[in-house]
């Protein structure tokens, strides 16, 4: 065969756009991205075949996951489950389960530096005393994650990034006039850890209407959120979204996916 030639179009270089609390596509499908890079937000539709693991945004803005596949009904459910883990019947046999509460498709905002997609298998070697090299290798675990440094620290975003936080917003008449509107994150006490999908979209340098898309179907934010306040530099903080298995999906597609539009 001839000597290989490097292909510049296969070398990726480009910034990322990060979205939090997103839907997972049906297994074998890909998250749809518009020509401008905007992710599609799937909604319920009538008389459609759905499979376990597929997600939609319901009429209340919460994310529902199909846990029993089939064909959706001719009309949408009157009431959607609005507590994580609550099931909703749809048509003759489809069951949706509330997977995450809104806001859905929250844009993470400005990023600093590198955004890392880590796809890692834990491999253990099998050895034999008769051999100096391992005689086999077996996968025993998996660690997949997306890590990034964020710059925008409004509480609307922090509600998805502080696992034990509770978000609220409103108006407080005790505050000074002109500064009575507020948003806050309260923390302290045992509560369930939010788990949701994370989507990273990066534009190709050679094809401005095509993208590389990385997604983790279900993740939790594992880092301590450290918010430095100083005069000389803007506040930044690092977050890591650690994948967990979505057991409603088939083996081989339970963690996430990366695909490149060609």
Residue ranges and their predicted role:
Residues 1-39, 100-108, 262:
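Polar/acidic, low-complexity leader/linker segments enriched in S/T/G and N/D
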Residues 134-136, 203, 226-229:
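Beta-strand-rich interaction surfaces with strong enrichment in secreted/lumenal proteins
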Residues 124, 130-131, 150-152, 157, ...:
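Short acidic, glycine/tyrosine-flanked loop/strand segments centered on an H-E-D-like triad
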Residues 38-102:
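Tryptophan-rich substrate-binding surfaces of secreted polymer-degrading and adhesive proteins
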Residues 100-142, 147-149:
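A glycine-rich, hydrophobic loop/mini-helix early in the fold
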Residues 156-215:
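Short helix-loop boundary/capping segments
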Residues 212-262:
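Mixed-charge, glycine-accented linear interaction segment located at domain edges/termini
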Residues 135-158, 232-248:
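Oligomerization/assembly interface segments of phage tail-like spikes and tubes
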């Amino acid at each position: 065969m001839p000597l290989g030639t490097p292909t510049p179009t296969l070398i990726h270089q480009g910034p990322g756009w990060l979205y939090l609390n997103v839907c997972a596509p049906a297994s074998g499908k890909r998250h749809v991205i518009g020509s401008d890079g905007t992710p599609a937000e799937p909604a319920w539709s009538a008389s459609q075949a759905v499979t376990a693991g597929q997600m939609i945004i319901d009429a209340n803005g919460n994310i529902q996951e199909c846990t029993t596949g089939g064909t959706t009904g001719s009309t949408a459910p009157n009431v959607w489950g609005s507590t994580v883990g609550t099931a909703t019947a749809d048509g003759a046999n489809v069951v949706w389960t509330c997977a995450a509460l809104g806001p859905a498709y929250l844009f993470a905002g400005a990023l600093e530096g590198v955004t890392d997609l880590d796809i890692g298998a834990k491999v253990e070697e099998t050895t034999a005393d008769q051999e100096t090299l391992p005689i086999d290798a077996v996968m025993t675990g998996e660690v997949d994650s997306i890590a990034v440094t964020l710059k925008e620290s409004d509480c609307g975003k922090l509600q998805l990034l502080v696992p034990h936080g509770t978000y609220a917003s409103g108006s407080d008449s005790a505050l000074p006039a002109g500064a009575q509107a507020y948003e806050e994150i309260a923390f302290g006490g045992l509560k369930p850890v939010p788990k949701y999908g994370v989507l990273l979209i990066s534009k190709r340098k050679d094809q401005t209407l095509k993208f590389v898309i990385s997604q983790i179907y279900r993740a939790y934010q594992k880092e301590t959120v450290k918010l430095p306040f100083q005069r000389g530099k803007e506040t930044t903080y690092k977050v890591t979204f650690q994948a967990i298995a979505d057991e409603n999906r088939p083996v081989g597609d339970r963690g996430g996916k990366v695909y490149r539009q060609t």
